[in-house]
Amino acid sequence: MTVLTNSLTEVAQQTRQAAIQLAGASTETKNQALEAVAQALEAATPEILEANVQDCQQAKAAGIANALYARLKLDATKLKGAIAGVRSVATLEDPVGTVQLKRELDTDLVLSRVSCPLGVLGVIFEARPDAVMQIAALAMKSGNGVLLKGGQEALHSCQALVKAIHQGLSNTAVSPNVVALLTSREETLELLNLDQDVNLIIPRGSNDFVRFVQENTRIPVLGHAEGICHLYVDQAAKLDQAVEIAVDSKIQYPAACNAVETILVHDAIAPQYLPKLTAALQDNHVKVLGDAKTQAIVDVGPATETDWATEYGDLIVSIKVVASLSDAIAHINQYGSGHTDAIATEDDQAAAVFMNQVDAAGVFHNCSTRFADGFRYGFGAEVGISTQRMPPRGPVGLEGLVTYKYQLKGQGQIVATYAGSDARPFTHKDL
């Protein structure tokens, strides 16, 4: 792989040159490349799964945390789903070349704002080999090159995946150099210094890791931090429905960043709801912790102040009884990570207040927090979920990987014509 024989600067420059060519590629060319990549991944499935088994065995021996192991493991079903995600990106509308604004400044002087690729992305992620396929597909469709740096625990899986991607692209009009893999820890720090060649860094990991990246690079950072997600069960909730939402939000994939970590319950329904909830969670092997009011109703372990600010990423959940909707919102805004928070209620006014006042990228009403996902949103896939307030926010798909440029077409006009006492007026007419 070129990344192993060339310096990182050389690799980044090769990726940038390939991205410049890709930026001008037609939608058909990019879609053909994505289909070729999907076919190559299918053909390489045995090698990819074998590499992942090697990674998983080494990770187990090293005592990897359960949450990281769940993200690391790539079975045939998960791989098949990721390949389907690559194909789904090909069906999405091309985000490049969209005319966002067209305005006549004067006769034969027309301004357009047109979407264009960012350039080269640097994506650093933990034990998520499936992220390689998601990110590579989105980068190619949006006309960007990408430098991928996975966690060391996923090294063999990432190498097998990128090898297949390169093989798929080798017979297309898209250069394999648009996707490159970094393999050493030292390259992570070096990547952060490549502000001449990399246009956006996307770190996927803990808050501490994202903060470290932000403090050690001059490159813009799209922060994807922890997912401390909440479910608030209001006094007007349908209790059985709220149990189903809570269980799905916790157990469907507990290692995911959109899994619920804290459940807040209105005290008016706590005596009826908590026994149902804890029984359902414990039947699914979830360790339940609770505040003093929760412990007075059901037999669970104690939740401490630390628990409210913890992303478990595992079959653990904390429960707190609150006196009101406003108390629930205050708790979420204090301890949440701004990822995804949900309310279960039949009171539309309460739901509206919750959805307006909770500060998160995703606010849901009567549904699982697990819906916070680019594929489920119809984005095809995602490079990550941004919890920052500036856009892009939430699951970042194609639209978050393009910027725009202003194109002005004239017939020899000069600014002097439009200045001075007899200045020619602008027409400023939208076309």
From Swiss-Prot:
Gene Ontology cellular component annotations, sorted alphabetically: cytoplasm
InterPro entries noted in UniProt: Ald_DH/histidinol_DH (IPR016161), Ald_DH_C (IPR016163), Ald_DH_N (IPR016162), Aldehyde_DH_dom (IPR015590), G-glutamylP_reductase_CS (IPR020593), Glu-5-SA_DH (IPR012134), GPR_dom (IPR000965)
Keywords assigned by UniProt, alphabetized: Amino-acid biosynthesis, Cytoplasm, NADP, Oxidoreductase, Proline biosynthesis
Similarity annotation: Belongs to the gamma-glutamyl phosphate reductase family.
Organism: Acaryochloris marina (strain MBIC 11017)
Annotated EC: 1.2.1.41
NCBIfam families recorded: PRK00197.1 (NF001221), proA (TIGR00407)
Pathway membership, UniProt: Amino-acid biosynthesis; L-proline biosynthesis; L-glutamate 5-semialdehyde from L-glutamate: step 2/2
HAMAP family: ProA
Location within or outside the cell: Cytoplasm
MF-aspect GO terms: glutamate-5-semialdehyde dehydrogenase activity; NADP binding
GO biological process, one term: L-proline biosynthetic process
Protein name: Gamma-glutamyl phosphate reductase
Functional description taken from the UniProt entry: Catalyzes the NADPH-dependent reduction of L-glutamate 5-phosphate into L-glutamate 5-semialdehyde and phosphate. The product spontaneously undergoes cyclization to form 1-pyrroline-5-carboxylate.
Catalyzed reactions: L-glutamate 5-semialdehyde + phosphate + NADP(+) = L-glutamyl 5-phosphate + NADPH + H(+)
PANTHER family, A to Z: DELTA-1-PYRROLINE-5-CARBOXYLATE SYNTHASE, GLUTAMATE SEMIALDEHYDE DEHYDROGENASE
Subcellular location, principal: cytoplasm
